């Protein structure tokens, strides 16, 4: 008959990760991303989405900024400053680095992370695939809506009514397909036009490539509709507290499951 299984997700301390007031660069609209600068996070696609967003809306660095919390010279990824300056021409829009060399431990403490999340208006992740998405949930706990690639676990966190949701078919829309940008009550699910095979050294999964123009439209929607931003922020926080708080949600699930274990 097979094995019975129980899924219990990661959690977050929502009494620690919470909305606070922090200064923002020129009070600009800040698109942020907390991730490792590595292959599957697709950071260049986020940079191009941001470029499209500011160009189509004629925004200056006083109007909008891009905050990339990651090691900007990680050997697993890209040279962020080089890409911003020489490929996309958005170096003036970048918030200065919020951490140094990851391998040397040059990163902020937990309190610093709360400050970083709260500098953002929205959290964006063009990921090619996730096992869960801890920064996504931490951002929600801080009251930040997510604009995230609609692949693997993203729907569960940003789109579903609850984590224990039905499986969702994962199919690309194709290069000529409908953009199908999905607005939820706490963020946007960005469609992916195509998939690529990753290398065997990275376990060879298929990685999604998010639609850069669709993501730019999501940024624009939040920029122009601050009432929606405010409502989604409130909903993101409420969802994180209800479903991902360690004490109120995750720990009770573990306690209930442990009672069923036969030794």
Place the predicted regions along the sequence by residue.
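A short alpha->beta transition loop at the rim of the catalytic pocket in nucleotide-sugar-dependent
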Residues: 121, 143-145, 150
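Conserved donor-binding/catalytic core segment of Leloir-type glycosyltransferases
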Residues: 23-41, 47-50, 67
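Nucleotide-activated donor-binding/catalytic signature segment of Leloir-type glycosyltransferases, i.e.
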Residues: 77-115
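Carbohydrate-associated surface elements
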Residues: 11
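C-terminal alpha-helical cap of glycosyltransferases
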Residues: 225, 246-263
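Short hydrophobic beta-strand element within catalytic cores of glycosyltransferases
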Residues: 145-148, 158-159, 165-177
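A short, well-ordered alpha-helix in the C-terminal region of glycosyltransferases
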Residues: 214, 221, 228-243
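Aromatic "clamp/platform" in nucleotide-sugar-dependent glycosyltransferases that forms part
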Residues: 128
């Amino acid at each position: 008959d097979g094995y019975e299984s129980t899924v219990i997700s990661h959690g977050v301390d929502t009494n620690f990760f919470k909305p606070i007031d922090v200064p923002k660069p020129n009070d600009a609209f800040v698109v942020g991303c907390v991730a490792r600068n590595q292959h599957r996070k697709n950071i260049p696609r986020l940079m191009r989405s941001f470029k499209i967003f500011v160009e189509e809306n004629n925004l200056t660095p006083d109007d909008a900024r891009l905050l990339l919390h990651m090691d900007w010279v990680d050997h697993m990824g890209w040279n962020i400053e080089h890409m911003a300056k020489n490929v996309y021409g958005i170096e003036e829009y970048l918030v200065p680095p919020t951490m140094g060399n990851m391998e040397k431990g040059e990163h902020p403490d937990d309190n610093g992370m709360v400050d970083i999340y709260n500098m953002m208006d929205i959290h964006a992740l063009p990921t090619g695939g996730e096992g869960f998405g801890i920064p996504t949930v931490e951002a929600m706990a801080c009251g930040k809506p997510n604009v995230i690639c609609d692949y693997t676990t993203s729907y569960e966190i940003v789109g579903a009514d609850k984590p224990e949701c039905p499986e969702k078919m994962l199919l690309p829309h194709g290069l000529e397909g409908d953009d199908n940008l999905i607005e939820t009550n706490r963020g946007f699910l960005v469609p992916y036009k195509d998939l690529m095979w990753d290398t065997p050294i990275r376990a060879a999964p298929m990685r999604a490539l998010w639609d850069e123009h669709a993501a730019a439209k999501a940024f624009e929607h939040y920029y122009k509709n601050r009432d929606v931003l405010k409502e989604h922020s409130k909903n993101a926080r409420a969802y994180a507290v209800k479903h991902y708080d360690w004490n109120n949600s995750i720990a009770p699930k573990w306690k209930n499951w442990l009672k069923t274990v036969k030794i």
